[in-house]
């Protein structure tokens, strides 16, 4: 079992971003990510949801869910989704993913109650749909902004009680 560490080392801050600014600027403003890029992302989230609900979830499943939840949170902040239902769905998914991480950190099984699992199932389906419709440039911009936001939180929130960091 991989341990959850409450803090991240500064080495995390020196890792390269997944996408470069050049990739962001050259990505399509109208077309979504290519199918070969978005399908593995959507499939990983659906596999993680399935593992949480019906199998034995691993740390990698949690990471896939956390990545999707963090990216969705950034997309909400960018104003990509303005519908209250979408905002509620993504907020519920983030809460469920945090709960899974806490449970793992305390040596408990990564399981959710029926309501949380329902939110996570909805989120998994919605995430795949989002990837099919948002332009590639928006996705890459959100991905870069998410990485930047998480790094800033790690640097600026040392000793803060406002954020809980679960790094696995």
Placement of each model-derived feature along the sequence:
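Short, flexible domain-boundary/linker segments around small modular repeats
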Residues: 14-56, 85-109, 148, 152, ...
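Short, low-complexity cationic-aromatic patches
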Residues: 51-64, 105-122
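Amphipathic alpha-helical binding modules
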Residues: 109-168
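Short, positively charged, Ser/Thr-rich terminal linear motifs in low-complexity/disordered regions
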Residues: 1-13
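Extended intrinsically disordered, low-complexity coil regions enriched in Ser, Thr, Gly, Ala
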Residues: 66-99, 125-146, 150
């Amino acid at each position: 079992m991989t341990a959850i560490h409450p803090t991240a080392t500064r080495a995390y801050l020196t890792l390269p971003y997944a996408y470069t600014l050049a990739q962001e600027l050259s990505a399509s403003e109208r077309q979504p990510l290519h199918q070969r890029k978005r399908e593995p992302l959507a499939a990983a989230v659906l596999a993680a949801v399935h593992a949480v609900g019906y199998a034995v979830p691993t740390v990698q499943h949690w990471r896939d869910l956390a990545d999707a939840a963090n990216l969705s949170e950034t997309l909400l902040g960018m104003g990509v989704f303005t519908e209250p239902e979408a905002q509620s769905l993504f907020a519920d998914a983030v809460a469920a993913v945090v709960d899974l991480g806490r449970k793992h950190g305390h040596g408990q099984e990564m399981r959710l109650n029926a309501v949380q699992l329902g939110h996570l199932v909805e989120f998994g389906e919605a995430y795949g749909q989002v990837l099919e419709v948002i332009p590639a440039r928006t996705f890459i911009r959100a991905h870069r902004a998410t990485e930047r936001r998480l790094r800033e939180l790690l640097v600026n929130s040392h000793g803060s009680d406002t954020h809980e960091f679960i790094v696995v």
